[in-house]
Amino acid sequence: TTLRVDARAVHEAGGSEAQELGGLMAHAVDTMRRLEAAGYDIKAFPEQALFTLATGANYGLEIAKLRAARRLWARVLEAMGLDSEPMLLQSVSSARMLTRYDPWVNMLRNTAACFAGSVGGADIVTVRAFNEALGVPEELGRRTARNTQIIAMEESGLGRVADPAGGAWFEETVATDL
């Protein structure tokens, strides 16, 4: 069973990266407390949780946000007296960054979000259809979304490096600040 801890609503409502991270951790802690109150053993929660964050086109900041999420989760587990478990993290390209006036530019925005998700360490990267802002995505939009991830992985080798942003001054500093 997978339990989703999702902070995309904070992002899509205009929240900052710090607010999105705060919402994510608050959602996780609230879910754990509710499960505990209902009699469940919360020690199993970390390995059953799927954390979901939105990623926008500002890839430097988005990479740092994803890295900060992992650090924050480790601190939450420590504060609750639980063993540190790897965080299953999903990155979903932002709906608020998509425009209906020029949907073709959304391909570039989605590519930046896909890059941020991959380099930021997301286990699952989901790219929205570039024409989603116009209504129900058409076949071309869905196919492009799927292929964006494949091209990023195969052509640029994003999946071949364990931690491409590790040690980068900007990413480490911003992740710490967040």
Where are these regions (language model features)?
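Anaerobic metallocofactor- and corrinoid-dependent redox/one-carbon enzyme cores
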Residues: 1, 9, 90-99, 107-110, ...
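Catalytic alpha/beta active-site cores
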Residues: 1-58, 80-90, 118, 124-128
